[in-house]
Regions:
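C-terminal cap/linker of serine protease catalytic domains
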Residues: 1-19, 111, 163, 167-225, ...
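Active-site region of chymotrypsin-like
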Residues: 23-25, 84, 88-97, 120-177, ...
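A cytosolic small-molecule/anion-sensing beta-strand core signal
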Residues: 42-43, 162-163, 256, 285
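Gly/Ser-enriched beta-turn/beta-hairpin loop segments
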Residues: 75-82, 129-145, 193-201, 212-229
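Short, well-structured beta-strand-loop connectors
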Residues: 103-108, 161-167, 247-254
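PDZ/PDZ-like domain segments forming the peptide/carboxylate-binding groove
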Residues: 149-159, 210-254, 258-261
Length: 302
């Protein structure tokens, strides 16, 4: 019994020490929401947080460990990867120790946040460690990391740290409020672009698209011959698609020869590498096959 008690005490002490070390670089982010979120001091004077928690672009404040409140400014936000970057005066606040190493399923992890200056922690495991995936908004995320732990909204944007003591990802709430994590390698890439330009490059088609099934259900469109494609429901007057000759009511059925079934597939194809490329669109126009070449533009800043 004594050995068991000593082992548990040692585990408890090491866990608390790991949280304490990590929490030195974790802040609370106040941006007009119902409650604050958390953020990671990623580089000197640079805080990373979850893009979805920012209710406004101005009047952002940070609560540092210990409770001191400071002003922060938005450097950029990328909803496609759920990464936002803030600038502030660190005044000696340590930068988080990070790693690009991918976690494994079963790894024991800690989610560390900041609640009004106090440390916030949740213990769990990596439930699923998968490969690259695309978010619903088209962002490329290097690893799919699903967590088996209780993540509160206040902890969203905080650090996911492994037994080695390094921050491997940022914790966020995914669909159905399941805890997932954005890996450090994805964050690094987003931070570089957001600091340089305030946004992450994304391709721009300049066309509003909708699944043809929705139109069929209302009797609006006959669809393509084989049932594939997405319907063009709006066009940017100055956008690439309008300039190339795309028309309202066209059905996009293929992208460089690859069949298109869902709007989400088009979003995935409009990644940073697509800007400036010429794409061959397969179409159904008035019930007949057609084709069009479109030079992909850069998504304008809203």
């Amino acid at each position: 019994m004594a050995e068991t008690t000593n082992a548990l005490a040692a585990l408890s002490d090491s866990t608390a020490q790991l949280v304490e070390r990590t929490a030195r670089s974790i802040v609370a982010v106040h941006s007009g929401g119902r409650w604050p979120a958390s953020g990671i001091h990623w580089r000197s004077g640079i805080v990373v947080t979850a893009e979805e928690v920012l209710e406004r672009d101005e009047n952002i404040r940070l609560t540092l460990p210990g409770g001191r409140l400071v002003e922060a400014s938005l450097a950029g936000r990328d909803p496609t990867t759920d990464v936002a970057v803030l600038r502030f005066q660190p005044d000696g606040l340590p930068v988080a120790a990070t790693t690009n190493a991918a976690p494994r399923a079963g790894d024991v992890v800690l989610a560390v946040g900041n609640h009004e200056g106090s440390s916030l922690a949740a213990l769990g495991i990596v439930a699923l460690a998968g490969g690259p995936w695309h978010s619903a908004r088209g962002g490329t995320i290097d690893n799919f990391i699903r967590l088996d732990l209780a993540l509160s909204p206040v902890g969203e944007g905080g650090a996911l740290v492994g037994a080695h003591g390094q921050v491997m990802a940022m914790t966020v709430l995914g669909p159905r409020h399941r805890a997932i994590a954005i890996p450090a390698s994805t964050i690094e890439r987003a931070v570089d672009q957001l600091l340089a330009r305030g946004q992450v490059f994304r391709g721009y088609l300049g066309a509003g698209l909708r699944p043809i099934g929705r139109e069929r259900a209302s009797g609006g469109s006959a669809g393509s011959a084989d049932g594939r494609g997405v319907l063009v429901v709006s066009l940017d007057p100055d956008g690439p698609s309008r300039r190339a000759g795309l028309l309202l009511g066209d059905i996009v059925t293929a992208w460089n020869g690859k069949p298109i079934d869902r709007v989400r597939e088009v979003m995935h194809l409009l990644g940073p590498e697509s800007v400036g490329t010429t794409v061959d669109l397969g179409l159904t126009r008035g019930g007949s096959p057609a084709a069009l070449k479109v030079v992909i533009g850069e998504r304008p800043v809203k």
